[in-house]
Amino acid sequence: EVIIPNTIDGKKVTSIGDEAFYENKNLEKITIPDSVTNIGNAAFSGTAWYENQPDGMVFLGKVLYAYKGIMYGNTNIVIPDGTVSISKNAFCGYLGLTKVTIPSSLKKIGEYAFGSCSSLRDITFSNGLTDIGDKAFYDCYGLTDITLPESVTNIGNNAFEGCSRLKNIVIPDNVIIIGDAAFCNCENLSEITIPNNITNIGKEAFLGTAWYNNQSDGMVFAGKVLYGYKGVMPENTSIEIPFGTISIGNSAFCDCSNLTNVTIPNSVKYIGKRAFRNCTNIDNILIPDSVTAIGDSAFVYCTSIDNVVIPNSVTTIGENIFGHCTSLKNITIPDSITDISYGTFSDCTNLENIAIPDGVTNIGEYAFYGCENLKNINIPNGVKSIKESTFNGCKSLINITIPEKVTNIGDYAFTDCESLVSLVIPNSVKKIGYRAFENCSALETITIPNSVTSILESAFDGCKNLTIMGYKNSVAENYAKENEINFIELIKKIITGDADENEIVDVNDVTYLQRHIAGNKNTDELPLIDESNKDVFESVDLNKDGKLDVQDVTLLQQLIAGNKE
């Protein structure tokens, strides 16, 4: 038996993954909470519970998990009221299915739920449905007409791809996203009605439709979205996007290497994913202050762009948006940005200086990977982690200050930073990752505090002239000895109440003192606090009675509370 709880570690359980209990042959009873709305592919296949279910629709809680057994021709399915979602692959490939009625309680149709149901001719949706998953009706080429309810907000990738007999579609006003290839190869789809407020239309959403084939060469619009550019673009083309356009669609100008200049009007709010990907001859881009978001990889491989100003109106920039912009020298990031995502400036080999706004709290993996001419960069105080390969290959980076809130330096974080000479790790850092400073050949000194409890393998490989500065019997000293790195011992700064000797007095010192009083030992089977060290002992013997006990714990708690006030 398995009982899925409502919450795990304080987080509501909403999903059960693919093959989560697959082939668990002894599993006879399953209880799931109402919070679960998504059950993955084959999550319970091969279990005794599933084998004992009668043929037909199989439910788990309020989720239609699967259809079991043989389905004969001309089958009409009425999904019962109260069902909130249809799971991934639930009816996939059932050729006998011809009609489906969906209740108003249903919110989501999962991936491939009706995929390849080629005899499906009639589907009745009810208002209440919000999410049509990826490939939900893929290759349902028996469908000729569908009416989507006004409640729908998301049409997934490839949702109706290959529905070759579908003739017209009205996209409801509440739809926010039409996914990549959502109606691709619906070759008889000639009429498409798109609301004026939609901004996000995916790559090739209408490719291969009669509607698209009937469009003239040049810019193609779907509602107020610049959907794409059709036909062969002449050399040295300049594009002026008309005012009133509210969005540049995903991949709209992708691979338009003949595009040299583009004028974006002040009506555009969103620049889509890959919108200008690999437009290698655009050398300048002016982003108007109407834009609020720029999608992933929007300008990736625009190798001629040398200067970009992101206006204050922009609050979101996607992953890898300027990756491989090898001519980019100057970039202005506004204070409105709080997150620099994965690979944002990766391989911008000519980028020399960048000012990161103080409000930024996250710098993603590979954000500045391969920026070999980057000399200086500021990391804002709100950043809590230096992630994997964030500054890997920044060969010209001379110095960098790691802020006091950083707790982790990720794998390869500063690998091949050949010009970095010295570095001080703050007291907040607990872990230095695998090969974090590998081949920092000019690195002469690094100061590592007692807060660091883990230094992973090869963290300083190739740092031939390195001296590690740290404290006696610390992880830093042990690492230096094990790897034959020169070590200089620092004199500990004695601070009243600093039981764990990391130069920070906080609640961790209370726990440390309590553990010492209880008789806990360190890894060398020595007492946690060296009571023979007069200075250390006196710093935690707060009532000065010559012994460490619960009275000192109480005084330490009061000291910390007073510091916070």
Language model segments and positions:
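Cellulosome-associated attachment modules in secreted, modular CAZymes
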Residues: 491-565
